[in-house]
Each structure stands twice: as structure tokens, then as C-alpha cells.
């Protein structure tokens, strides 16, 4: 085999792609179709709750097109990180969609289902053997962390996909997986240079993200050869350039030249990018450095508590000029009132109040380089986190009332400072999670 052709319909199953682009990609005779279906990008809630980031209907639409296309061409379909987080419940949800489509479309195929969720007993065993260590700058990892986790998954590399392909799988639905591994598996097992396979996979896993100006989620096509690979989006309106492809290595990476995978590191130091047509780019020189020890990244999510949120705006210029002092005084007043209401039943460490000020530094917090407030209004998002939803809601009610009437020296009499667009003013978010 001198060339392997790959079609990536979109960067996330459920985010959509153009049917016209997909049909054009199919007409170029791919050897397989691959699609990433998850990520840690949406946050820990999906791993913690077992829910997907995209609606079931959206995922089913994308899966139907991909399944029908793959079976029409009789080529494998590879899906990784099922239903966002890739735990067992996510995997089962996507498999059920696949089975529904197969029944509705009267499709028959050999399917491999690859699990990624890790049991607490297994993790504790490996921890005791010294086989687990925290990734910098993660905090200490111990049995307590394992016990607090709602779900823990291991991010698999290319090998499980390779094994399934060798066993004759025509459709592969995998739990949490390296996005890139989905696309690197078949080229590597067919003897193509690992550097080129992994680099092409890094671009393909985001669909059409490596074009100059992506208008919507869409397809990307790659031709991997022995000394280079070529990228071109099937949509004739989309253009790949050396800059658009090279700059994609900055996406989601601290180091744009060294990208770490389970089995080694993709090294782009000597990669070259060449415009070979108006819309296509040729890439060569990428290398893959095998790891001394194979590693699997663990991802876990634990429940922090329950949360209620208050959204309010402030437009008084006297108020805006002293917003930092006012929010500090508000927190003091709120904590004092919570103590009055709950006494020893609710200590300061049991709950948390956080205030984000949009129009000042709501996005970047203390990292915001612009210190002067020039806007005529501010938006405050006040988060209350507590052990239960009832407690979070109750404390949010306290915060709302304290914020409405907390005075500044320039005021005379009772004046309302905070304008809340919703009634009730607080929104209950339910359980919230963090990666651990």
C-alpha cells in the first residue's frame, strides 16, 4: 500500500457537518472514516454525570450519515471518546444509537466496543504497585481521590483500535481515547511512518479546523504517503494553507512542537508545510519518538457540591469606581448573615461564594492586564456552592438581598444597586464537578 486515504467528517460527533462535503469525501475513496466524539474541553460535568455534551438527536444524525457512508464503501468506521467523556454509560449510549440506526437502515456489520472506564478496585491495586503518579501540575493522587471520583477513564492510544481492526471490526466504538489515535491506528499498522500518521491524525481529529476560515463544523480529507501527507477540505469553499495547518499545532497544546501520546511523542520541529494547490497543503518531516515506558492518562471527575448562580448588572458610575471595595464588603456581610442564620451548622469551609465581574476581569481574573474600568456597566455573576442544592439556594437568597441594598458612602437612604434579569434571581445549577 503506497497511500492511505482518510475522511474525518467533523471534529466532534454531534457538532454536525455538511452532507455535500461528506459526499465529496466519500467520492475520494477513503480507506476508513474516523471521528472523535469527545474531549475534556467541555469540562468535568459530563464525566461526572454520565451525560453527553451534544443532544442525542444531533449525535444520531451524524452517526447515521457516517454509518451509511462507511457501509456503502465497505470501509471501517472508527469512533473514539464516545458521547463526550468515554465512560461506560457514555459508551452504552452511543452503542444504543448505532444499534438503532442499524435496525432502521437495515445495516449489518461487525462491531467492536472498547471500554475505557476503570474500576476503583483496579485503580487502588495499581496505585499500591506504584503504577500511578499525578501529571504535573495535578495534586496528590491517593485512594481518597479514587473514592471521591464519580467516574475514572483511561485515555487509550492507537493499540486497541489496531487490535479491533486486525480482528475484522467494521465499526469501532471506543470509550475515552486519544483523539489522534483514532486516525493514526490504521496508517501505523500498515507500515506508514509514525510521525506522518500521528501528525495527520492531529489535524484530522478536529475536522475542518485547520482551514483558513471555517464557516461551520465540516470535513477534512488526508492522503498519507511514505514521505509526506496531503490535507484538503472536501468543501470547495475551504482552503488549507501552510499557516492554517501549522498553526493548528498550537491548539490545545502547551508546546506546539512536542505532542505527547501514550506510546511516544510527536515531534514537529522539522515539519515543513508546502502549498501544492489553491486549497491543499503537503506536510513532511514530522517524526515520532517512541516512549521508554508506555503510559495511559487517567481522567477522573469528583462532585464538589451543588451550586446556585445570581446574575446582576450595575450601572451606577459611583458604584463602578469602587466595585472592588463593595464586593469585599458584600462578602463580609454575606458570611456574617449566613452565620446568623445557620450558626454552627454551616461553617465558612462548608460553602463558598465567588463573584465574577464582567466588564472588569470576568474572563481572565487576576491575569487581566487591563486594570482600568472604562465600561458604563458591569455584570456580576455570583456563584454559591454548598453541600446540598437547598443550602446553595438558601445562601443565594441571602446573597441576593445583601447585594441589593449594600450601600456606598455617596448614597442617601435605601437604594437598590443590583439589577437582576430573572425572577427568582438565582438559578439552580445542580451538582458541579471538577477534574481530580
What is each of the regions a protein language model found here?
Residues 2-9, 16, 34, 76, ...:
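Small-residue-enriched flexible segments
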Residues 7, 52, 75-86, 171-172, ...:
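Short glycine-rich or small-residue beta-strand-to-loop segments that form or flank ligand, phosphate
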Residues 12-14, 39-41, 82-92, 176-182, ...:
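Gly/Ser/Thr-rich loops at beta-strand to alpha-helix junctions
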Residues 27-45, 68-73:
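N-terminal glycine-rich anion-binding loops that anchor highly charged ligand groups
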Residues 75-80, 84-87, 91-107:
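Hydrophobic or amphipathic alpha-helical targeting/insertion segments
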Residues 108-126, 358-360, 419-429:
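Short, conserved secondary-structure transition motifs
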Residues 119-174:
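An acidic, phosphate/nucleotide-engaging active-site surface
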Residues 294-436:
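C-terminal non-catalytic interaction/assembly regions of soluble proteins
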